[in-house]
Amino acid sequence: MYVSNGKDTCQLLGPVSLFVQTLMGMTAVIVLLVKRNYEHPRRKMIVWSYDIGKQIIGSLGIHFLNLGISILKKRRRSLFAITAKGNDDEDQCDWYFLNLLLDTTVGIPILWLCLYIIEKVLKSLHFQNIESGNYFPSKTVGSHPRKPLFSAFVKQLLIFIVGLGVMKFCVFLILNYLEDLAYWFADLILGWSDSWPNFQVFLVMFVFPILLNCFQYFCVDNVIRLHSESLTITNAENFETNTFLNDEIPDLSEVSNEVPNKDNNISSYGSII
């Protein structure tokens, strides 16, 4: 990608890129709101907020991690340059784009596998309230009204962050061992925009992220949300009652104050699509 001795390079922390990143985040939230309106059954707003909160917090962490890796990678390559001309003039945008591409494609099945294994292990250790997408208590205490537990959200968020961390490590290894091929691929896709660095930032930080993130959010949301196939009377409270289809209404004869033990060793994570 284009690099000169001046300032016309792709800078991920420049004013244009920071503005575009903010706009990207706002657009992603709007897309997720639209997706919720077409759900059957539809999650309650507080439950949806918890599900999306896990993705947003995790995505912010991965986003800034990608920025940091991209910038440090560029500085390290510049520090160890051998010749005056250097063969390490790849922009920060190269590495960021490649991280983004793998995070939102190859990273999704890796994340699903990580979450599946983590939850299965924790359930075998009898951890409570870790069923993904179910934030209501597994037991009813007295006559107190049942409401989503923030502690359940925190537990599931920590599981999600650990899964993201493992996924990010796998993606980093893939890029690190296939670095030359990765940079060639980035230059093939982005090289034509070298003469317009601000436009290149717009592509890398907005256009591609919007397209890739929409795909990623859709897939990951399907993984972490509570699926209608797993509905029981104890977890149906996560959904708005007037949005159930006829074949999704849980059997009221299954009323119980405790989640059946048969689910203790079964992961609640759904399919990617």
Swiss-Prot record:
Which GO cellular component terms, listed alphabetically, does the Swiss-Prot or TrEMBL entry include?
A: fungal-type vacuole membrane; membrane
Membrane protein topology class? Multi-pass membrane protein
Residue ranges annotated as Vacuolar topological domain: 1-13, 73-97, 178-198
> Membrane side Cytoplasmic: which residues?
35-51, 119-156, 220-273
Its name, as the record gives it, is Vacuolar membrane protein YPL162C
Q: Which species?
A: Saccharomyces cerevisiae (strain ATCC 204508 / S288c) (Baker's yeast)
Query: What's the chief localization of this chain?
Result: membrane
Q: Where are the transmembrane segments?
A: 14-34, 52-72, 98-118, 157-177, 199-219
Keyword tags: Membrane, Transmembrane, Transmembrane helix, Vacuole
List the subcellular locations.
Vacuole membrane
InterPro entries in the record:
STIMATE/YPL162C (IPR022127)
Question: What further note is attached to this protein's record?
Answer: Present with 1440 molecules/cell in log phase SD medium.
- PANTHER family hit by this protein: VACUOLAR MEMBRANE PROTEIN YPL162C (PTHR31735:SF1)
Q: Which domain of life is it from?
A: Eukaryota
